[in-house]
Amino acid sequence: MVDVNKFESMRIGIASPQKIRYWSFGEVKKPETINYRTQKPEREGLFDERIFGPQKDWECACGKLKGVFYKNQVCELCGVQVTTAKSRRERMGHIELAAPISHIWYFKGIPSRMGLALDMSPRALEEVIYFASYVVIDPKETDLEKKQLLTEREYREQLLKNGFGSFVAKMGAEAIQDLLNDVDIDKEVAELKEELKTVTGQRRVKIIRRLDVLSAFRKSGNALSWMVLNVLPVIPPDLRPMVQLDGGRFATSDLNDLYRRVINRNNRLKRLMELNAPNIIVQNEKRMLQEAVDTLIDNGRRGRPITGAGNRPLKSLSHMLKGKQGRFRQNLLGKRVDYSGRSVIAVGPTLKMYQCGVPREMAIELFKPFVMAQLVKKELAANIRAAKRKVERQDSDVWDVLETVVKEHPVLLNRAPTLHRLGIQAFEPVLIDGKAIRLHPLACEAYNADFDGDQMAIHLPLSEEAQAEARLLMLAAEHILNPKDGKPVVTPSQDMVLGNYYLTMEEKGREGEGMIFATPEEVEIAMRNGYVHLHTRIGIATKSLNKPWTENQQDKILVTTVGKVIFNSIIPEGMPYLNEPTDVNLTTSTDDRFFMDAGQNIKEVLAGIDTVRPFKKGYLGNIIAEVFKRYRTTATSEYLDRLKDLGYHQSTLAGLTVGIADIPVVEDKHEIIDAAHKRVEQITKQFRRGLITDDERYNAVTGVWRDAKESLEKRLIEEQDLTNPIVMMMDSGARGNISNFSQLAGMRGLMAAPNGKIMELPIISNFREGLSVLEMFFSTHGARKGMTDTALKTADSGYLTRRLVDVAQDVIIREDDCGTDRGLVIADIATGKEMVEPLFERLVGRYTRKSVLHPETGEMIIGDDTLISEDIARKIIEADVKEVTIRSVFTCKTPHGVCKHCYGINLATGDAVEVGEAVGTIAAQSIGEPGTQLTMRTFHTGGVASSSDITQGLPRVQEIFEARNPKGEAIITEVTGTVESIVEDGATRTREITVKGKTDTRSYTVGMADVLMVEEGEFIHRGAPLIQGSIEPKHLLQVRDALSVETYLLGEVQKTYRSQGVEIGDKHIEVMIRQMLRKVRIMDNGSTDVLPGTLMDISDFEALNETALLNGEMPATGRPVLMGITKASLETNSFLSAASFQETTRVLTDAAIRGKEDHLLGLKENVIIGKIIPAGTGMFRYRNIEPLADLTNAPEVKEVETETVEN
């Protein structure tokens, strides 16, 4: 076997007949498979042991030679070579075809490669190959032309006219092979290149296509005639197995049936040719053989597919590769692994951040080899076999050994669907009773897991390296931040939030208010003995609390609550005392208003201070982020565990319950509803009188009900009582939101009909009052639509993620600095008045490209090529700087990846990104994972704001990444200049906008309903939109440059996600958009040897021109091309990656003709061939590290040890 980690690239080509015979271990001459009586393979049949190897390890067919002793000997009785049975997966056979047969991939593909090579139409080829017409191969002296088609009748007429032997014309693939052999590639290419200089239009396109194919053959060293087969390879039998079922029947792979048809027809053809049968019979048999081979290679590509039992089309060789069930996606990219298990998950509230509970039964099976080795090592079992028996009997001493084996051996937990890298994390196993895996409650958010029956898979890293990697890189305690936005992903939820909220509540006049304590311990004693309540406002001496107080806060008394003293006791030292949920308190210090002098009257002080709101979920997230910023991973995960324990403990003590009496009643609800009814009546009257259109009426009515619902909601918020359990759950962020609350206590409001339109009849009741039958019926519409939408959305979002991963999987951080001199100018992203993404968020964690100066003083805030920290970003914003030039992925010069400086920090760690980080995959996951949170709908605004439907949500994201023409397209100006006039034309209901540039004037026609974005006299740059809508990016690319398009697309993606409340770091979107603009289309090839119209990678294009310029030749010119992500994935340089994505046969056909070489730069192609991936620790620079000279002198160490032993 080849060591897969040693080879550097993989090449594909067309197999020559000699090569096929060289691969083969013998010819398959008979269609037989196995003998039905002896169950042994037939000789010279499809399962022959002499050709394909023995069925049993180290044993020949007749059983004369048995054992490894006879390795590689050939038995003289049965002729089988003694070797392993695995050779039946590797050894090929062949069939010598009685007539040449065309390969359907090259004849049928689009464009037909055979047709281009011969300059014949695919239709003409089909007529010749399937024996409908003759083709003239050599016209000799006659007036026929080479490659001319003749029907049977014309052929006979020409023979009569010119006499036998006066010209050569043939039928079938044989004729095509002769023609292909006649093609002189070099001569053809030279002639076509000459012709290319003069022609235009369709002819030019055709010549470029032909040149493309011919030069591909010339470069790759494939011969044109190899597209026609003389020998057919037979794949190894274990890849097309035949297995016996219980009833003595056999189940077999479809390929065996297809091969049998080929062999039968081939043998019949041989016999007919030996008998000198009439030509017409032989021709028919040849045609049948051609069809049989076509079906074997690609069933259904031509004509009706051949079906097996039950009208099911047979799976041909091509189908074995294609699709989700094909070889690529099912077996190469989606292998099942040993040392794994799955079970239902249950909550493990007592676990630490880095632990998970593993059922003993599961662990004993997973760790079996380790336990067995340990049993032998500890001499509890004589040998491995005895140890195995012990483990299977589950002897008592096995469990003790298991405890030691499991200790500090991390396991991986994975929950499907794995939408981002946090869907697989490492934990240290803790053995537990029961059968469910226990999961830490804080890890749920990353997995999107809950305990309503979810299952998770567990995997065991085996090697030392794998364990080290799992522990250092994948341990759950390390994954505090979410890679998509750098915010904490492990935030407390539900009970934990509720407990901490309850703990930090304040109430006036609770028992023991105004007591002053010396230490936190005193506070706790007082609380336990019932002198004070958790919510009681008290005073405590600041010096007893180990916190960073300011000068004038020391030796004073802090006014706080009992609960907050407890809450602050778990916060890491060095953090301010948190007394109110504000950022100032969190980042700098406690507010001075909460302090009093020792002699002051605390009752008076308390009267002057309002009660402070408790700490909600969002604020707990801010605390975690701040702790992480200051103390990094370990301290944060310890704090998180303390926060979790405290939250659970306090919510248990609080014991919140919910009863119907807890749902408040809005006193004047009926007044609000009556007013709405009256308003609707007025609107209907106006409509009846013809004052408003039906659309306007509909919008007004739905508007009225929306307002009614909102005013009820407002009333509820104003009157809410913070001690109400439902309000506490909602306000704290533990469960539910205002909309759920208003459905319980206000009104349910408007519902969507099945067609997605909102119904005018609202549901006036709420759940407390109960719904009428009709209202219940209406509300089921909305509920069902919600369910179906979610299901559809999940599938759509998953497919989007798959395409994104495919296009960016080879983007890896490859070097420290690419040394580019270009940058990206960034500012706030806003739509009209609404802020989408502020400059501050775009700056943090990026490198500058130019120094930033203070606009007023002119002093330098930060130099060139420096990392912008949060503090510096804050300074830049405070200095009122509007634009900053930063290093960006868009302008990075690193080929096949990005450099550290252009990428910035790794959002998941908050530190500089490391070389080897697979940023492409992370970017794809970051964009794809929140895809399910985006809406599905394209909004029908019902003719209010604009006539066009604005696409939003998931469809808009797809539209952007697939570079489609957007719905509701905005017209852009192609010249820079002044808007000279906007003229309305009442007759055609249009407006004409005239833009006057320096050299030319353009006018654009827009509809009356379109919202204008420009006004008369305004100066605009080319590419600026004239009306509201989405710009078509391909058009923008023609008018402006690539960087403008990239910037526009980045803004559009951010708008779509942020409008739904999803935050994603710019850099992820930059990575994806850069992949869409990686290619250049050659416009003029200069003196290089590329063809005009070729697509090239930017880096290859630059290298090509560099060489041309160094040799003093004319460089090629090209223009950037914007490709959708699907097309970009298929245009990748790696044929393995492209073939495993989509259109497998097309990709492979093309790659074979070009003799493409895959340099295995991406992740996917390495996974396919089973090589370690070139990212992270698998990167070349990390794998070949020579250890430094042995610094410790080993013998000396040993001597010291022996001395201590003796002493």
UniProtKB/Swiss-Prot annotation:
Its EC number is 2.7.7.6. Mg(2+) binds at D450, D452, D454. GO terms for cellular component: DNA-directed RNA polymerase complex. One of its GO terms (biological process) is DNA-templated transcription. Zn(2+) 1 binds at C60, C62, C75, C78. It comes from the Bacteria. DNA-dependent RNA polymerase catalyzes the transcription of DNA into RNA using the four ribonucleoside triphosphates as substrates. This is DNA-directed RNA polymerase subunit beta'. It comes from Lactococcus lactis subsp. cremoris (strain MG1363).
